[in-house]
């Protein structure tokens, strides 16, 4: 750790404090994540170290690069490439005007490329949200914190006792499914896509049941026809209110037909029928995709 000089605290992640830091030897600016684990007394589990070490192999232009893993005295530091801003802050700063459609399209396309790459290596994210999508001034967007959920679990609260958001969580997880797939990340990205377009969260639930019911009120309460097996999921209740599905043109009014078609496939109830990242990249919505540069106020 003596090779790094902390410049400033840039945030508080799910697992610990994040600092902007400088490598004293190379001058490289990095993001330093200090991982706080409940097992501080026993040290860092070897399984976590193994999982994290595998992530150093994930090299892709749309994945935030894990440069190094430093394990000292029961503490774990992850050294990542540094990016200037996250999508949440950028959307908040652009709340009045919104993001231009070509930029939304570019961001979604890049994020799907990153997902397709990770999914092809059988790595899931499980906790995608605008806060862990990082952007730079050149128009790139990258997925951060990939694979951390598998190494450390997804806590209910962060180390500062903030509630970990449910807004982007797939219905199969909310219904208690223990064995989920890459489709959970596609669901999260679908929610983020809608949020970029409408400038507000699609399903801003404040509890697991509120989260489910918000989804049901928009997409209709799922049954065996749309989602075979749903009624036998651990947390499914026959007493759930039966809501009808809303028209997508009312859910995301600014989106054209191609955009609505892609979004509805990303938000398919049945994870087996949900579009894959690879298939989504070939969707007609991306026929005219470009890479515009965002107006960042850094």
Swiss-Prot record:
Pfam families: Pkinase. Binds 2 Mg(2+) ions. Mg(2+) binds at residues 132, 145. The keyword Nucleus applies. The modification N-acetylmethionine is found at residue 1. Its main location: cytoplasm. Residues 4-286 form the Protein kinase domain. Phosphorylation at Thr-14 or Tyr-15 inactivates the enzyme, while phosphorylation at Thr-160 activates it. Stimulated by MYC. Inactivated by CDKN1A (p21). Its EC number is 2.7.11.22. Serine/threonine-protein kinase involved in the control of the cell cycle; essential for meiosis, but dispensable for mitosis. Phosphorylates CABLES1, CTNNB1, CDK2AP2, ERCC6, NBN, USP37, p53/TP53, NPM1, CDK7, RB1, BRCA2, MYC, NPAT, EZH2. Triggers duplication of centrosomes and DNA. Found in a complex with CABLES1, CCNA1 and CCNE1. Interacts with CABLES1. Interacts with UHRF2. Part of a complex consisting of UHRF2, CDK2 and CCNE1. Interacts with the Speedy/Ringo proteins SPDYA and SPDYC. Interaction with SPDYA promotes kinase activation via a conformation change that alleviates obstruction of the substrate-binding cleft by the T-loop. Found in a complex with both SPDYA and CDKN1B/KIP1. Binds to RB1. Binds to CDK7. This is Cyclin-dependent kinase 2. It comes from Rattus norvegicus. The lineage of its organism: Eukaryota, Metazoa, Chordata, Craniata, Vertebrata.
């Amino acid at each position: 750790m003596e090779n790094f000089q902390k410049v400033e605290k840039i945030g508080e992640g799910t697992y610990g404090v994040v600092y902007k830091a400088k490598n004293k030897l190379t001058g490289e600016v990095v993001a330093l994540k200090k991982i706080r684990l409940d097992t501080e007394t026993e040290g860092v589990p070897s399984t976590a170290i193994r999982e994290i070490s595998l992530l150093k192999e994930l090299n892709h232009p749309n994945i935030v690069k894990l440069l190094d893993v430093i394990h000292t005295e029961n503490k774990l530091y992850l050294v990542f490439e540094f990016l200037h801003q996250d999508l949440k802050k950028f959307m908040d700063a652009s709340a009045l005007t919104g993001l231009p459609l070509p930029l939304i399209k570019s961001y979604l396309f890049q994020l799907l490329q990153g997902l397709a790459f990770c999914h092809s290596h059988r790595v899931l994210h499980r906790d995608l949200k605008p806060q862990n999508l990082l952007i730079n001034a050149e128009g790139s967007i990258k997925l951060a914190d990939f694979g951390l959920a598998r190494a450390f679990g997804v806590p209910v609260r962060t180390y500062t006792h903030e509630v970990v958001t449910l807004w982007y969580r797939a219905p199969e997880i909310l219904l208690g499914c223990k064995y989920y797939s890459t489709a959970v990340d596609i669901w999260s990205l679908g929610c983020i896509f809608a949020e970029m377009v409408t400038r507000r969260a699609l399903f801003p639930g404040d509890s697991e049941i509120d989260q489910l019911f918000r989804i049901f009120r928009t997409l209709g309460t799922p049954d065996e026809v749309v989602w075979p097996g749903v009624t036998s999921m651990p947390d499914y209740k026959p007493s759930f209110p039966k809501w009808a599905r809303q028209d997508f043109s009312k859910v995301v009014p600014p989106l054209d037909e191609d955009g609505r078609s892609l979004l509805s496939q990303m938000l398919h109830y049945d994870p087996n029928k949900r579009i894959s990242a690879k298939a989504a990249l070939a969707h007609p919505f991306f026929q005219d995709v470009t890479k515009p540069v965002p107006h960042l106020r850094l």
